[in-house]
Amino acid sequence: MRRTVSIQACAVVALALSLAAPLYAHHVKKGESTTLPVTTSSPKALDLYRKGMEDYENLYLERCNEDWRAAVKEDPNLAVGWAWIAFNSTNPEEITSARAKAKELATKLTAGEQLMVAWISKVQEGDFLGGITAMNDMLEMYPRDKHLLYLAGNWLMGENGNDQAKRLFEKALSIDKNYPAALNDLAYVDARNLQFAKAFAAMERYIALLPKEPNPQDSYGELLRMSGNFEGSLLHYRAALKLDPDFVTSQLGLGDTYALMGNQEQARVEYDKAIRFAHNEADRLTYSMQKAMTFVREGNYAEADKGYAEIAATAHAKKQNLQEAQSYRHLAEYQTDDSTAWKNLKLAEEALHHQSIISPSDRNEEMSRILRNRAARAAHSGNQALAEKELHELEALANGSRNRVIQSSYHGAFGTVLMDQKKFEAAIPQLEEDRDNPFTLELLVQAYYQTEQTEKLHEAEAKLRGINVPTMEQALVVPATRAQRPHI
């Protein structure tokens, strides 16, 4: 496991993410120490903060929050502790208050710590370029701090910046060739690039370095699943749970793997266990959405409707508005009736604005997905004026942000609308900017077919057929594609 975006947009994305890799313009004074210092008056708080970082690297994603909460209780002025609570918590109210506390204390910190706080806070507040610049300056100040290189690379992977992340992991491993956290994430980058032999070799090293930790087994299970080796995946997830029965992400992994294998009944059994032992409310809701998706995979849409509606209601009651919005969006994505889908997408948008505690970055990313779906639905129903309206709103969101997720939503939506207009040549460059999405890949295959680009068609179709990720897009596109004869 690892800690799981106009015409000018391509250039904007390239610019923003190119800034993520250290540029070494030498405009930032190097730190006096090799590693980033931590300002605190309490040795116990420092130990707890460092334990939190160790737990974070080993993917104990709720335990590290508990460590950091204990650290700031020992020293309420531990700004970087507050910053990482804001970064990693799943509680919107806690995220908002912790970020405010970190920013309030920032003036008392060293320059490097100030950059760390700025990176986290600016990104969450929607200033993507400002956050990347702060992160980049932090890395330039402490170029041999392997932990900072990992933290930055791990975040970049979540923003689809795989190439930039890979360079950071490789640099971290040049400092310490046996650094487990970087080795783990580098394997994920290789797997995303379909270089599974390299990824599996890294996993063997990762397990050897941390034989008593569950995450190496969990990661190996996920990468094997990505490659299509489901039985091998199940073995490693079970091995992780044997090492730590409370490593709930491996329990979730069993459910996800059975779902991809087509055994939805067993998937629900495994998901129920994950839901029961979830460490926080946000995770419990997310696992419940995965369970509801099994009914979509079975074609039991009435039961799926019921499941997602119940999750949305629970999320609303628990003030988990992001998960409420996600539930309504998923409910819309598999509907055959465009008006029903549109109704649920409207509810998804409303959920994002029930309270102001959702971070701007989370709100904007989810809104970009909602707008993408609305543009596609409008185009599908033949309402080109409405499709253009939704696309223009998404374009405005993309032009105001360097966020790669938002940029991808825009390109995917633009390409979808162009495909509906039979503008295949114009659609291709837009779709190619979002080619990891099964919805987009399906359209890209059609566009290559219509423009007689046979080699690219085969490449895109092979990639589409090989996608083994437990997402709604995969559920709606990939099994149906596999059931059809390949093009040409």
PLM regions and their residue ranges:
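Residue-level recognition of tetratricopeptide repeat
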Residues: 44, 53, 77-78, 87, 120, 145, 154, 179, ...
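Canonical tetratricopeptide repeat
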Residues: 84, 151, 185, 219, ...
